[in-house]
């Protein structure tokens, strides 16, 4: 099931990042930081009272000089968060009191019609709040709570309010073999064009279904390769002077799409090359264990010389080294060049993500691998692998039972991963290795 998204919005310096970091630092049911964006730490997957959700910190949008720029930043921040989130957590500052900027944001939130919880930060009072707290009810938003992010007061009540606004949990997930495909990439990489090309090229589109993300459209397609649902995240077309804000929220759309997908199509603009943002988006797919295909779009616009394709392939491998297992396809969504090859690759990596190895086959490979390259040692003690077994799929995950996992080394684990790929394929799929001591302790 797709996780609800909660966006923290508010003017600068009201404590958005402080609240986010308090939750992160105290590990209040935090599952893990969303991979690929830990440097910014603006996304975290969280659970409260049995409901998983994604929290977004819109911190880091600091004002430039001039009130107009500040208001522009707040407006862009709030608008994009509204589009992305299922629930808005609107943070204000009790010590500063109700401000004109708070009122302007509240106007936008009321017009949007999204569920909102007003969170008044920097309240160190237990029980009855001071008169200035009740001024925030004048914002015209029904749910108002008081917290202190710094002193960890009121967080439970705030989280209870948030999850009460979530859509009902839908347990009726698809059980058929429909492959959910997320097309992710930077703004203007061609996500919408590719989605339209894939849908338009097929005569057997069953339906267009409104997706769980507000402006996402899911296209259901059937062809000779099977049944596919394309999750298009191309609704993000806003232009603005605050480009970093736009790019940060393109990550939110990618995050929501990745969460729902079986396979990720990572779309790269051939003219722009592989950027840092591309690497971070690809990291979402890799670290969430998704089968992936890297697609270089707009290849028709690149002037070709001998070795041009090979050069681009090398650039992709160099800048996305953690995804060296993913196939690379060069296309033009605009002209349709080589787009017909994409469904075959999607089907292949999907099937690889669900591949299971018997314990006997796996242990035969491990034995041969250890014979070829002995396990690492430390002070005369060798790592000993007693046996291995596959514990899950999507991604393929293998538990190796050992004498002492501290004797292992990432380079040897990488060697074992390479042996798995050499013997069994797994193209397009990350592989997870879990080292467990005989007492059950896990790496």
Residue ranges and their predicted role:
Residues 33-69, 75-87, 211-241, 259-263:
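Switch I (G2) and immediately adjacent beta-strands of P-loop GTPase domains
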Residues 56, 60-110, 137-139, 143, ...:
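Hydrophobic alpha-helical bundles that form the membrane domains of multi-pass transporters
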Residues 117-122:
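Hydrophobic or amphipathic alpha-helical targeting/insertion segments
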């Amino acid at each position: 099931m797709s996780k609800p998204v909660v966006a923290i919005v508010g003017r600068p310096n009201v404590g958005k990042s402080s609240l986010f970091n308090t939750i992160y630092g105290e590990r209040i049911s935090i599952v893990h930081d969303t991979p690929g964006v830990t440097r910014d730490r603006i996304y975290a997957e969280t659970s409260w009272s049995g409901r998983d959700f994604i929290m977004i910190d819109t911190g880091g949008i600091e004002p430039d000089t001039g009130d107009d720029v500040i208001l522009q930043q707040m407006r862009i921040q709030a608008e994009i968060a509204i589009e992305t989130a299922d629930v808005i957590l609107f943070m204000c500052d009790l010590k500063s009191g109700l401000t004109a900027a708070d009122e302007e944001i509240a106007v936008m939130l009321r017009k949007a019609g999204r569920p909102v919880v007003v969170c008044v930060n920097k309240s160190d009072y237990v029980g009855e709040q001071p008169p200035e707290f009740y001024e925030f009810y004048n914002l015209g938003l029904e749910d108002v709570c008081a917290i202190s992010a710094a002193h960890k007061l009121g967080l439970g009540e705030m989280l209870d309010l948030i999850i009460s606004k979530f859509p009902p949990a839908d347990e009726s997930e698809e059980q058929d073999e429909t492959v959910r495909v997320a097309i992710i990439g930077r703004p203007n990489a061609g996500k919408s064009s590719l989605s339209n090309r894939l849908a338009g090229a097929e005569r057997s589109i069953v339906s267009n279904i409104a997706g769980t993300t507000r402006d996402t459209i899911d296209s259901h397609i059937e062809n000779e390769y099977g049944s596919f649902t394309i999750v298009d995240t191309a609704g993000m077309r806003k232009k603005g002077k605050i480009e970093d804000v736009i790019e940060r929220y393109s990550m939110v759309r990618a995050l929501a799409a990745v969460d729902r997908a079986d396979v990720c199509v990572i779309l790269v603009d051939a003219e722009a090359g592989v950027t840092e943002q591309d690497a971070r988006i690809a990291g979402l797919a890799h670290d969430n264990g998704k089968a992936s295909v890297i697609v270089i779009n707009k290849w028709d616009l690149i002037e070709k010389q001998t070795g041009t394709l090979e050069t681009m392939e090398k650039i992709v491998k160099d800048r996305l080294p953690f995804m060296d297992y993913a196939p690379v396809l060069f296309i033009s969504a605009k002209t349709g060049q080589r787009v017909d090859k994409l469904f075959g690759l999607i089907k292949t990596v999907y099937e690889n993500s669900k591949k299971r190895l018997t314990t006997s086959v796996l242990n035969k490979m491990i034995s041969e691998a250890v014979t070829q390259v002995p396990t690492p040692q430390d002070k005369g003690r060798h790592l000993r692998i007693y046996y291995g077994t596959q514990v899950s799929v999507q991604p393929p995950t293998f538990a190796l039972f050992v004498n002492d996992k501290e004797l292992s080394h990432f380079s040897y684990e990488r060697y074992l991963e390479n042996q798995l790929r050499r013997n069994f394929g797994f193209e397009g799929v990350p592989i997870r290795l879990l080292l467990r001591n005989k007492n059950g302790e896990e790496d």
